[in-house]
Amino acid sequence: MDHLSVKSFAKINLGLLITGKRKDGYHTLETIFAPINWYDTIGFSDSDVISMSCSNIDLPVDDNNLCIRAARALQQSASCSKGAAMNLQKVVPFGAGLGGGSSDAATVLRVLNELWKINVSSAELHELAVKLGADVPYFLEMKGLAFARGIGDELEDLGLTLPFHVVTVFPEEHISTVWAYKNFYQKFDRPVPDLRLLLQRLCLDGDRSVLGAFENDFEPAVFDHYPKVRVVKESLLDAGSFYASLSGSGSAVFGLFDTLENAAGAVCAMQQKGYRVTLTPPGFSMEAQAGSRL
């Protein structure tokens, strides 16, 4: 291997229902993960040691970085002494609820397992992924829409893609997931709809009456504390989105659009306001790892 570059895609959450809190302090949830066409790029080069550089000087490149932690965890799991020099071209905003760091960690696990030829099993990789972060298993194991429960690590591939244009906006606010879980407005006693069945009705039957059930439980508190995020959602709806929502714990907001014309108009409007924006086409799924290499 001289040099290899791999795309690392982000996600949005279509609905995020917080269902309880475990004895260990972690919250349980149910959500739909959907991939979007917003990605970081990770370059891998031969090295005797594990090292990292990053295009964003605000991100650590030591053991506090998930990519480094993922590489070391894999190395220790396989009792492997091989190394790699990684370069992260950071494009996906952090503190946005898009899972960029988790996706990067999953890419490192998957790619180094192959490059080092250590044959760590899928089950072992899953365990490593869960320890790195609740969203990491999704990026490691799924390509399209997936239902998640538990802390987000219990996954079911739904075999579907969104048949809509998706506009995702970063309002230039960084929101801590820890803050979001401390401040969301708890409502554990409400009935929880089956998001899987509702998603099938939406994607296969075009039944938009189900969209009201796809709530994000972080949204009310985030909107109260970060009013700019609420304005972005309202702007997407004004631009023709038939559904808009916070992604994860925010601050990114996405909107679903029927037509490319309306979606492109929303992208232009958001960019003119100085926001970072991406447009994801209908039917998008994360490419197989070979197809994601540059």
Curated annotation (Swiss-Prot):
GO BP, sorted A to Z: isopentenyl diphosphate biosynthetic process, methylerythritol 4-phosphate pathway; terpenoid biosynthetic process
UniProt keyword terms in alphabetical order: ATP-binding, Isoprene biosynthesis, Kinase, Nucleotide-binding, Transferase
UniProt keyword annotation of Secreted present: no
UniProt similarity note: Belongs to the GHMP kinase family. IspE subfamily.
Catalyzed reactions per annotation: 4-CDP-2-C-methyl-D-erythritol + ATP = 4-CDP-2-C-methyl-D-erythritol 2-phosphate + ADP + H(+)
Function description: Catalyzes the phosphorylation of the position 2 hydroxy group of 4-diphosphocytidyl-2C-methyl-D-erythritol.
Pathway: Isoprenoid biosynthesis; isopentenyl diphosphate biosynthesis via DXP pathway; isopentenyl diphosphate from 1-deoxy-D-xylulose 5-phosphate: step 3/6
InterPro entries reported in the protein's UniProt record: GHMP_kinase_C_dom, GHMP_kinase_C_sf, GHMP_kinase_N_dom, IspE, Ribosomal_Su5_D2-typ_SF, Ribsml_uS5_D2-typ_fold_subgr
NCBIfam families named among the record's database cross-references: ispE (TIGR00154)
Residues that hold ATP according to the record: 93-103
Keyword ATP-binding on entry: yes
Active site: 11, 135
Source organism, top-level taxon: Bacteria
GO MF entries: 4-(cytidine 5'-diphospho)-2-C-methyl-D-erythritol kinase activity; ATP binding
Protein source organism: Chlorobium phaeobacteroides (strain DSM 266 / SMG 266 / 2430)
Protein name, as recorded: 4-diphosphocytidyl-2-C-methyl-D-erythritol kinase
A Pfam family of this chain: GHMP_kinases_C
EC numbers for this chain: 2.7.1.148
